[in-house]
From Swiss-Prot:
Signal peptide annotation: 1-46
PROSITE patterns: C1Q (PS50871)
Protein name: Complement C1q tumor necrosis factor-related protein 6
Molecular function terms from GO: identical protein binding
Organism: Homo sapiens
Main location: secreted
Length: 278
């Protein structure tokens, strides 16, 4: 509570100033004034026996005396004595309450933009061994192979000649026809073929491996005073039913292949490498 200013009655211009505070009013007055202020009751005007030349003045106001002329004019006006007006001044800071409880949490904000990709982390430890998978479908094992030999020598004639073979080394599923001297592809795929012959002294060796009616590769040796072994091999992409066989060239070029009844000098072999649907 700050000091109060008391104003003199107009009838008495004594030139004196009266100041009073909560210490003069006492604790009871201070509590009463505080109660009246909080209840918004109009201010009370008090009357003193003598008038005070100035109005209510706080202790912190200027200490200069009032103008005597102003005091004299106030006393000669003939107005009745007025009660001094007391206006309490309360420092609001002393009425500050306790700190309130925190309010409820607000709604989550919007998701921010995606940040840049971080650097790769260290390699993790090896995981546990996985369970064994379910068994797969059984493979369809398909093997086709043949190997045949000839012990009879052959000379060129008026026309092309197909080499026939008398001896069978391998003929799986009968894929090589001994009567015609031809291999018939049982399914589409890649096949490998090889041919070995013995040349004849002073004669050419002129033989073709045929794919159907087309010459695939040639086995050739020039005339020589010595006879030697010659070989040729090839891989062919065959469709189902394609035929592969060996053909000797005709007489317009004198040629022959050598063999005898004791040894097998001429052989023709082939087998499936990979079926198309594998």
């Amino acid at each position: 509570m700050q000091w109060l200013r008391v104003r003199e009655s107009p009838g008495e211009a004594t030139g004196h100033r009266v100041t009073m505070g909560t210490a003069a009013l006492g604790p009871v007055w201070a509590a009463l004034l505080l109660f009246l202020l909080m209840c918004e009751i109009p201010m009370v005007e008090l009357t003193f026996d003598r008038a005070v030349a100035s109005g209510c003045q706080r202790c912190c106001d200027s200490e200069d005396p009032l103008d005597p002329a102003h005091v004299s004019s106030a006393s000669s006006s003939g107005r009745p004595h007025a009660l001094p007006e007391i206006r309490p001044y309360i420092n609001i800071t002393i009425l500050k309450g306790d700190k309130g409880d925190p309010g409820p949490m607000g709604l989550p904000g919007y998701m921010g933009r995606e940040g840049p990709q971080g650097e790769p982390g260290p390699q993790g430890s090896k995981g546990d061994k996985g369970e064994m998978g379910s068994p797969g479908a059984p493979c369809q094992k398909r093997f086709f192979a043949f190997s045949v030999g000839r012990k009879t020598a052959l000379h060129s004639g008026e026309d092309f000649q197909t080499l026939l073979f008398e001896r069978v080394f391998v003929n799986l599923d009968g894929c090589f026809d001994m009567a015609t001297g031809q291999f018939a592809a049982p399914l589409r795929g890649i096949y490998f073929f090889s041919l070995n012959v013995h040349s004849w002294n002073y004669k050419e060796t002129y033989v073709h491996i045929m794919h159907n009616q087309k010459e695939a590769v040639i086995l050739y040796a020039q005339p020589s005073e010595r006879s030697i072994m010659q070989s040729q091999s090839v891989m062919l992409d065959l469709a189902y039913g394609d035929r592969v066989w060996v053909r000797l060239f005709k007489r317009q070029r004198e040629n022959a292949i050598y063999s005898n009844d004791f040894d097998t000098y001429i052989t023709f072999s082939g087998h499936l490498i990979k079926a198309e649907d594998d």
